[in-house]
């Protein structure tokens, strides 16, 4: 069982790491540079939902046309809880990796506690596992990552943020 972690907005604000679309794209391309030396890969498997965007970028850059998903729910808003496999990797993709994942690339945005990574590793133990960001608890479970952040950091991904109007600092300047 995974312990429940409640991160309200006030707690997250002190350890916030906002990532812009531009920065995320650069980080995904940097990840691809590293992965290019490891491949080739027969398929990319995105861990949804966070792994969808980096998987698309990595697959494009590496020229991989077969993209699959494994859908695992681990967060409900800002609370991490029990893992639930909503959709497994397709049999045709598993077959490309000989059933163990050899030659397959698993991509996610972040490895946090490692719970999701551990579950996916059990499904495809020989696959190469890559994330854009890694926290210390989960880092040993991934093969390739770009940026490590502290365990108490909350990453705000660009798809979680919205552009809003910011009033001028000086009253009446607008």
From Swiss-Prot:
Any single GO CC term annotated in Swiss-Prot or TrEMBL for this entry: plasma membrane
Cofactor(s) needed for function: Mg(2+)
SUPFAM superfamilies noted in UniProt: PRTase-like
Pathway listed: Purine metabolism; GMP biosynthesis via salvage pathway; GMP from guanine: step 1/1; Purine metabolism; XMP biosynthesis via salvage pathway; XMP from xanthine: step 1/1
Location of the protein in the cell: Cell inner membrane
Catalytically driven reaction(s): GMP + diphosphate = guanine + 5-phospho-alpha-D-ribose 1-diphosphate; XMP + diphosphate = xanthine + 5-phospho-alpha-D-ribose 1-diphosphate; IMP + diphosphate = hypoxanthine + 5-phospho-alpha-D-ribose 1-diphosphate
Family: Belongs to the purine/pyrimidine phosphoribosyltransferase family. XGPT subfamily.
Protein name: Xanthine-guanine phosphoribosyltransferase
